[in-house]
């Protein structure tokens, strides 16, 4: 990522930080925006991680989360369930020694709150204007919220 920023001459404008969202010690009110792609469902404590990100955001700062979701429309829902129950684990056994990795993804998606519930959790933690948009036939959602 750092190399890409340098090539685009953005390395002085954008900084990349490595850390744990639940315990990150960045200063209060220090970030204009926080983006997370396919990571929030892996938080050990969802509300704690979201609250810590809220603490770090400046007033009016934006949170954008891209996360997998479970499609609700026929026939996408049925194909999705079939694929994750039968095809994904079979491919995992055929091509990988770590078959657990191929069962973890559908399990973690199933355990993650649905779109309305996750939006409610964002608001419970203290975010304002929490909303979501389904993308990819409902296979993922983009959540937006503001401090």
Regions found by a protein language model. Give the residues of each.
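A short SAM/SAH-binding and catalytic strip from SAM-dependent methyltransferases
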Residues: 32-46, 69
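A short glycine-rich, Lys/Arg-flanked "PGG" loop and its adjoining helix->strand segment in the class I
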Residues: 47-62
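Conserved H-loop
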Residues: 10-11, 27, 128
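Core SAM-dependent methyltransferase catalytic element
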Residues: 119, 123-147
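Conserved SAM-binding strand-loop segment of SAM-dependent methyltransferases
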Residues: 9-23
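A short acidic, Gly/Pro-enriched loop at the edge of an enzyme's catalytic core
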Residues: 19-34
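C-terminal alpha-helical "lid/dimerization" subdomain adjacent to the S-adenosyl-L-methionine
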Residues: 66-121, 125, 131
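Conserved SAM-binding loop
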Residues: 1-2
């Amino acid at each position: 990522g750092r190399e890409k920023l340098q090539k685009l001459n953005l390395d002085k404008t954008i900084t990349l930080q490595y850390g744990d969202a639940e315990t990150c010690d960045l200063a209060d009110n220090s970030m204009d925006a926080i983006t997370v792609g396919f990571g929030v469902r892996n938080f050990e404590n969802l509300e704690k991680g979201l609250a810590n990100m809220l603490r770090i955001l400046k007033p009016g700062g934006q949170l954008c989360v891209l996360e997998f979701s479970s499609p609700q429309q026929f026939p996408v829902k049925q194909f999705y369930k079939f694929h994750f129950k039968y095809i994904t684990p079979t491919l995992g056994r055929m091509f990988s020694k770590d078959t657990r990795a191929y069962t973890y993804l559908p399990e973690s998606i199933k355990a993650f709150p649905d779109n309305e519930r996750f939006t409610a959790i964002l608001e419970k933690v203290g975010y304002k204007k929490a909303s979501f948009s389904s993308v990819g036939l409902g296979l993922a959602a983009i959540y937006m919220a503001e401090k």
